[in-house]
């Protein structure tokens, strides 16, 4: 075999190269170099790793050419390609290694400095590449770092089933610069040093396809100066304390760098965020699994005008899930589970010169946190509405508003409280079936719900403005007293609005307070209190439901009450409406069914059913009313064996029907203006006044008290008349009906034929100028007085 050597100066590598060239098929050339230092980027990493180069000694090159190797050179197998050719390696290639304390690489590939730079391409299968070197003092400060692989000047390296290993503190896995490209397929990269998994500079690109990376200590992957890292197809990156850091240069004009992470996983236990993009970086995460097990830092962090796209996948963090600093984030179909904030947005610590991009859209995502699901930091600028679509946010605090923001939730479920910590005018809109379950403490925020959305309030809440066309349930899980919902400015309830509230009899405060109120829709009330029927309408109670600072001029379309009203008699109802005495209050009150309206628990009617042994007194004026039920709005019907007392002489209703028990009135004027019908065994009890109504039926009239009752109607009642005291005056005997008269007072009759049988200890007085004829079999014993006219008796008895 013929072997030739050449010693040449490489401007690319800044050193002399001595190569042994072995003739191979396909014009492939392998070059081995004894130099213990190879070309470096002469750059200092942001994280302190120092990568510099020194020029190899010509004597070492000559010694290598002549076959005289030092023990160190014989132990290492450094491989270098810088010839603008294509080289194919396989598993038969001896392991490549470098252990020198100066800067060096086990494998170095570089393009050639011709017009446009000619790439050198190396492909390999089953290669083993190792480094354990570095650590010597750098004259410029720091320590030299060795690399397993170094790529420079548009080099192309494609490896499959490679095993790349670094050991020792001052080692790094991969360094790529100046447009170089690296592809690792089904390979392993095991990092035991402190100085990095890889560093990509100046427009370089690395692709990990089905590759496993395990890094100890604080080793990280640095992607900077317009470079790109692709992590694809089941690749796994496990970082002990490091991160994937994607960053541009040091100024806002530098080109951004990119991370494309797809169908792969990255995890870290370090205090730094597992994945971080800074200074116009682009983070594209698709169906990725990202795990951060440290309470400090975040699983994903985007800083300074970075664009973040998360599609699918799972993000789990013991700290923050997604941290957004002056950047634009789009999250679609991902699951975020964090012990700290699920999503945190801030403008604080933004570097000068970078646009404050802060924007967020979330769709088809599930965000869960032990603290805050979506946290908007103070002093933060949000440029566009935050859009939440078909997503769930679950945390003790679902949304925290520390700065002005407009949040639009569509088909989204918010479980947790809404808390505002600043005084800016934010807004939260729920639409397209969105739900909020929690309380709201946001005095300066406008909350709105469309007709498909709902708010299940768990505790007393405060908002700036509330517009509701959906369903709101006012809850109080803590059992605190006071108002349930406070609207600092305007409450607007629209046509489809449903307000649901449970009344607490121990809490006298209004359930809603607002500065201005517009009512519409439906109010649904429920109560577990037991109803106790009062004995008079003077004991009716009321509860203020809504307390406004201005007049309430509108009303609900309907009000429902779910309560045990089995003990509530038919003549009583529960009414909801504006307080007649204070139009700034909307109240729930007990009232007469006579005046029931559209927002009463039962329809209006005129029936008073008073059970035996019970008495109910109506002091209110009963007038004709416009009823919406089958009742005519003017007829009073007394039912039951108890007693109904009418005490208002201003009553102006129509007919009276007494079907049972007693209807009593001190003054006959309380009976209204229509006819009176008294059923058999029923009683009309009067004390005074003029009964000018026509009285019919089989029941009786009882005159009580010491005053005078005047009866003037053409009466046909047949149940009899009882005078227990005072005077009963009838201008005509026909006014006394057809039944017997039991008189313990005075009966005065003017004229007519008194066919009734008179009994009792009372007296009979004939008044007026007319003629009165007595035809009954009378037994009264109080005597007879004729003050005028003629008194005739058919029989002396």
Language model features with spans:
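Gram-negative bacterial Sec-dependent N-terminal signal peptides
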Residues: 8-74
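Extracellular beta-helix/beta-solenoid repeat scaffolds
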Residues: 95-158, 164-166, 173-175, 182, ...
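Extracellular beta-strand/loop-rich repeat segments of large surface/secreted proteins
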Residues: 415, 420-421, 425-542, 612, ...
């Amino acid at each position: 075999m013929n072997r030739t050597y050449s010693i040449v100066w490489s401007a690319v590598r800044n050193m002399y190269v001595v190569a042994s060239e072995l003739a191979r098929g396909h014009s492939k050339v392998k070059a081995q170099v004894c130099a213990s230092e190879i070309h470096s980027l002469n750059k200092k990493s942001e994280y302190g790793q120092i990568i510099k180069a020194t020029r190899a000694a010509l004597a070492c090159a000559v010694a290598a050419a002549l076959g005289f190797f030092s023990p160190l050179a014989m132990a290492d197998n450094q491989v270098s390609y810088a010839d603008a050719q294509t080289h194919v390696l396989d598993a038969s290639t001896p392991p490549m290694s470098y252990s020198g304390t100066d800067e060096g690489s086990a494998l170095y590939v570089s393009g050639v400095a011709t017009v446009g730079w000619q790439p050198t391409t190396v492909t390999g299968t089953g290669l083993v590449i190792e480094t354990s070197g570095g650590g010597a003092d750098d004259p410029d400060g720091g320590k030299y770092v060795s690399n397993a692989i170094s790529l420079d000047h548009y080099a192309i390296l494609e490896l499959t089933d490679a095993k790349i290993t670094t050991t020792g503190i001052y080692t790094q896995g991969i360094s790529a610069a100046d447009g170089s490209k690296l592809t690792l397929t089904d390979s392993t990269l095991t990092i035991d040093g402190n100085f990095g998994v890889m560093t990509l500079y100046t427009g370089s690109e690395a692709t990990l396809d089905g590759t496993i990376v395990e890094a100890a200590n604080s080793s990280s992957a640095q992607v900077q100066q317009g470079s790109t890292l692709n992590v694809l197809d089941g690749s796994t990156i496990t970082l002990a304390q490091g991160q994937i850091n994607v960053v541009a240069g040091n100024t806002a004009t530098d080109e951004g760098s990119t991370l494309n992470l797809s169908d792969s996983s990255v995890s870290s236990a370090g205090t730094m965020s597992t994945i971080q993009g800074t200074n116009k970086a682009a983070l594209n995460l698709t169906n990725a699994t990202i795990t951060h097990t440290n309470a400090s830092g975040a699983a994903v962090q985007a800083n300074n005008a970075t664009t973040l796209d998360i599609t699918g996948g799972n993000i789990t963090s013991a700290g923050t899930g997604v941290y957004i600093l002056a950047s634009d984030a789009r999250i679609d179909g991902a699951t975020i589970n964090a012990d700290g904030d699920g999503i945190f947005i801030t403008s604080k610590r933004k570097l000068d010169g970078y646009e404050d991009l802060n924007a967020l859209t979330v769709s088809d995502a599930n965000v869960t946190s032990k603290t805050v699901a979506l946290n908007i930091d103070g002093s933060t600028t949000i440029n566009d509405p935050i859009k939440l679509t078909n997503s769930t946010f679950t945390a003790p605090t679902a949304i925290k508003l520390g700065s002005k923001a407009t949040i639009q939730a569509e088909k989204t479920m918010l479980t947790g409280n809404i808390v505002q910590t600043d005084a800016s005018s934010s807004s939260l809109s729920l639409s397209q079936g969105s739900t909020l379950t929690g309380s709201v403490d946001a005095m300066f925020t406008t909350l709105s719900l469309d007709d498909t959305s709902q708010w299940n309030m768990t505790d007393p809440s405060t908002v700036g403005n509330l517009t509701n066309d959906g369903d709101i349930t006012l809850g109080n899980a803590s059992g605190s007293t006071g108002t349930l919902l406070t609207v600092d400015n305007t409450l607007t309830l629209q046509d489809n609005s449903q307000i649901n509230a449970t009344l607490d009899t121990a809490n006298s405060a209004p359930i809603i307070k607002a500065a201005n109120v517009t009512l519409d829709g439906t109010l649904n009330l429920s109560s577990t209190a037991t109803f106790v029927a009062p004995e008079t309408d003077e004991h009716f109670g009321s509860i203020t439901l809504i307390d406004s600072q201005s007049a309430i001029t509108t009303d609900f379309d309907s009000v429902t009450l779910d309560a045990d009203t089995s003990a509530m008699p038919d003549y009583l109802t529960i009414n909801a409406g504006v307080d007649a005495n204070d139009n700034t209050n909307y109240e729930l009150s007990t009232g007469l069914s006579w005046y029931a309206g559209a927002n009463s628990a039962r329809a209006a009617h005129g029936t008073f059913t008073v059970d035996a042994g019970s008495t109910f007194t109506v002091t209110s004026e009963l007038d004709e009313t416009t009823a919406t039920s089958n009742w005519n709005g003017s007829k009073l019907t007394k039912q039951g064996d108890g007693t109904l007392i009418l005490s208002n002489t201003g009553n102006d209703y129509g007919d009276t029907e007494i079907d049972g028990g007693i209807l009593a009135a001190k003054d006959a004027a309380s009976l209204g203006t229509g006819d009176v019908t008294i059923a058999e065994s029923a009683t009309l009890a009067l004390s005074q006044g003029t009964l000018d109504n026509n009285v019919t039926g089989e029941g009786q009239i009882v005159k009580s008290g010491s005053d005078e009752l005047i009866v003037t109607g053409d009466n046909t009642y047949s149940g009899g008349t009882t005078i227990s005291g005072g005077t009963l005056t009838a201008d005509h005997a026909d006014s006394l009906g057809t039944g017997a008269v039991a008189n313990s007072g005075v009966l005065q009759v003017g004229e007519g034929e008194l066919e009734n049988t008179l009994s009792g200890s009372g007296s009979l007085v004939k008044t007026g100028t007319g003629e009165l004829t007595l035809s009954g079999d009378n037994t009264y014993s109080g005597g007879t007085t004729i003050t005028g006219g003629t008194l005739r008796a058919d029989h002396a008895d």
